[in-house]
Amino acid sequence: MPSFDVVSELDKHEVQNAVDNAIKELDRRYDLKGKGSFEFKDKDQTVMLTAEEEFQLEAMLEILRLALVKRKIDVKCLETKDPYPSGKEKKQEAKFREGIDKDLAKKIVATIKDGKLKVQAAIQGEQVRVTGKKRDDLQEAIALLRTKEFDMPLQFNNFRD
């Protein structure tokens, strides 16, 4: 029986490259030279932005988003927290989200069921497995999910016949 998985994954190397590009861009910017820094923690996939003022944090966040887009990483996976003061400077944390949580998985399953397609969707941890009798039904399910807007970028992998 044909099936595929709906997942939300990040390419760790591309994320690292995007952060490195943002750091280089920050060094090139005359208005931000020496006034801010990015600190990427690979272990928990977070970026700590540090700057003297809040408007500089906003500019740095925009630099990071542009670097992500250039590396073809969807910016919906970037979750930013509110800036907070730390001594003489301001800090802001940005976390890269990965995996499908239960609420999003339920929305995906509901979307597939509301589409009245001849497929079944089952939640399996941080992914949703979609099975059907024909490959065409699965392709319709993929097309349906691509038309909908979710708060996380979705990828479709493990397509089996």
From Swiss-Prot:
One of its GO terms (cellular component) is cytosol. The keyword Transferase does not apply. Gene3D superfamilies: 3.30.70.860, YajQ-like, domain 2. Keywords: Nucleotide-binding. GO terms for molecular function: nucleotide binding. Pfam families: DUF520. It comes from the Bacteria. InterPro entries: DUF520, UPF0234-like_C, UPF0234_N, YajQ-like_sf. Nucleotide-binding protein. Belongs to the YajQ family. This is Nucleotide-binding protein PputGB1_4497. It comes from Pseudomonas putida (strain GB-1).
